[in-house]
Amino acid sequence: PPKPQPKPPPKPQPKPPPAPTPSPCPPQPPKPQPKPPPAPTPSPCPPQPPKPQPKPPPAPGPSPKPGPSPSPPKPPPSPAPKPVPPPSPSPKPSPPKPPAPSPKPSPPKPPAPSPPKPQNKTIPAVFFFGDSIFDTGNNNNLDTKLKCNYRPYGMDFPMGVATGRFSNGRVASDYISKYLGVKEIVPAYVDKKLQQNNELQQSDLLTGVSFASGGAGYLPQTSESWKVTTMLDQLTYFQDYKKRMKKLVGKKKTKKIVSKGAAIVVAGSNDLIYTYFGNGAQHLKNDVDSFTTMMADSAASFVLQLYGYGARRIGVIGTPPIGCTPSQRVKKKKICNEDLNYAAQLFNSKLVIILGQLSKTLPNSTIVYGDIYSIFSKMLESPEDYGFEEIKKPCCKIGLTKGGVFCKERTLKNMSNASSYLFWDGLHPSQRAYEISNRKLVKKYIHFI
């Protein structure tokens, strides 16, 4: 008989298909990413979302780096339960670790701006006219007694050269030019070096020169009595200068340099000391009022001619208290000559009025009066405030020749302290007095120019 078919052995089916072994990692939170990964990546744990890291939390243990470390069996309590912060939907290059404002190498400090070299773009050049206060060597080639091209003059000038400046060093024109920001040393127009055709001398010519002549005055007879360059001849040199400039830079640029440059004039002291009170003996023919009016008219005429030659920025410096210079004190027993000082103040007062009238009359002009009288008066009244120890005697030994005003030649004894003297010789300030007075002068009037 047929064997009863044995019951098939129970299928090993009851074994449910091997459920995926429970992942040691907590169930993956639904990722807010737009594309959820369809299947777990080789790593059983989802790649840990990069921590935003704005503030690195004190992660327990080594902060798990997002990367292929396939065995993160450590159940880190932090990363998973933390609901992924909304800001990191698609790992926007997590503000690349907001480059902590730290190692942003602080930008190297720009080199400290070096002081501007003398070359003022607003005032491209300076032109000086007048007497010894501005003369930088124009008298050297003249047949005149009024020369200072010998020692001890210039003993404090660079290289100790006696250039013909009426001082132990620099003079007013040098300091005015320096404080206007143009250049530190102003050449004399007739200096032979300026006649050379090299580039250096030509650039020196472009930034201005001095036409002044020691001993000159507003009145022609003052200059003629000393055989020096008259104010009218200085204007002739100015015309010649313009011709040379046109050859160098052309007509248009020459016109600009002359009109934008500062033309500065100082005269009057020699008219009063020598022509009125001295050998000229004009005080016998004219009273001081009419003589100073004549001087002021001559000054106005000079300014008008300067304007006619293209100058538009014109400064006219008054007369200082010349009655207090060493050579003029002698006659009054070391006391200031008040007659001279009165005449100087009278002339200055007329100069202020006439320059004011010209300033209103001449279109596109800037005409400024420079009050040097009050600046020097303060230095005479309180010398210790400026570091001067001697205001009545000159620093150098005066010779009897040359009007009893100039230093004897080759006398260098006891002159190492020239800066403590207000006056260098019988009439002219020391280099230090020039420096202080002209710094104050420029500071006071620069905004007008």
From Swiss-Prot:
Q: Which PROSITE patterns match?
A: LIPASE_GDSL_SER
Q: What top-level branch of life does the organism fall under?
A: Eukaryota
The record's tissue-specificity note reads: Found in anther, only in male fertile plants.
Give GO terms: molecular function aspect only: lipase activity
One annotated GO biological process? lipid metabolic process
Query: Per the record, where are the segments of Pro residues compositional bias?
Result: 1-118
Q: Which residues form the active site?
A: S132, D425, H428
Query: Region (Disordered) spans which residues?
Result: 1-123
- Gene3D superfamilies recorded for this chain? SGNH hydrolase
Q: Which InterPro entries match?
A: GDSL (IPR001087), GDSL_lipolytic_enzyme (IPR050592), Lipase_GDSL_AS (IPR008265), SGNH_hydro_sf (IPR036514), SGNH_plant_lipase-like (IPR035669)
Query: What family does the Swiss-Prot or TrEMBL record give for this protein?
Result: Belongs to the 'GDSL' lipolytic enzyme family.
Name assigned to this protein? Anther-specific proline-rich protein APG
In the UniProt record, the gene name given for this protein reads APG
